[in-house]
Amino acid sequence: MAIAKRKPAEPVRIELKKEDTVKVLTGRDKGKEGRVLAVNRETGKVLVEHVMMIKRHTRPNPGKQIKGGIAERESPINASNVLIVCPGCHKAVRIAHHIDKIAGGKARRTRVCRKCGQTLDRK
């Protein structure tokens, strides 16, 4: 019997961007806020500053100038477990999208807070 090949997973649509401030909704770090350091759309995970800290044991390698010991670093968390924090109302909110007309007949999609309506995108 032949084994069926698994299809590659489709990239997840994540509304978060690097440098966004987010609040963790579930898990051992529930309630913590932090900046997004990286977004991985293939796995649907985000790396949040000072959230899901893990200890990494490394061996010393003098040839590569690596000092051994126990290093703490962030571990990725599922993007569905965080919400963006609105700079206007200072709450974890869902995101809406508005389409703004710009010069030349083009349109720009901006992220907007659903509660207060403030734009979440940086200029």
Curated annotation (Swiss-Prot):
In terms of superkingdom, the source organism counts as Bacteria
Query: One GO MF term, please?
Result: rRNA binding
Q: List the disulfide bonds.
A: none
Q: What GO CC annotations are associated with the protein?
A: ribonucleoprotein complex; ribosome
In its keyword annotation, does this UniProt entry include rRNA-binding?
Answer: yes
Q: Which GO terms describe its biological process?
A: translation
Report the Pfam families cross-referenced here: KOW, ribosomal_L24
Q: Which UniProt keywords apply?
A: Ribonucleoprotein, Ribosomal protein, RNA-binding, rRNA-binding
User: Which SUPFAM superfamilies is this protein grouped with?
Assistant: Translation proteins SH3-like domain (SSF50104)
* InterPro entries per record: KOW (IPR005824), Rib_uL2_dom2 (IPR014722), Ribosomal_uL24 (IPR003256), Ribosomal_uL24_CS (IPR005825), Ribosomal_uL24_KOW (IPR041988), Translation_prot_SH3-like_sf (IPR008991)
* PANTHER family the record matches: MITOCHONDRIAL RIBOSOMAL PROTEIN L24
Functionally, this protein is described as follows: One of two assembly initiator proteins, it binds directly to the 5'-end of the 23S rRNA, where it nucleates assembly of the 50S subunit.
Question: Member of which family?
Answer: Belongs to the universal ribosomal protein uL24 family.
Assembly with partners or alone: Part of the 50S ribosomal subunit.
What NCBIfam families does the record point to?
Answer: rplX_bact (TIGR01079)
Q: What is this protein called?
A: Large ribosomal subunit protein uL24
Species, as recorded: Solibacter usitatus (strain Ellin6076)
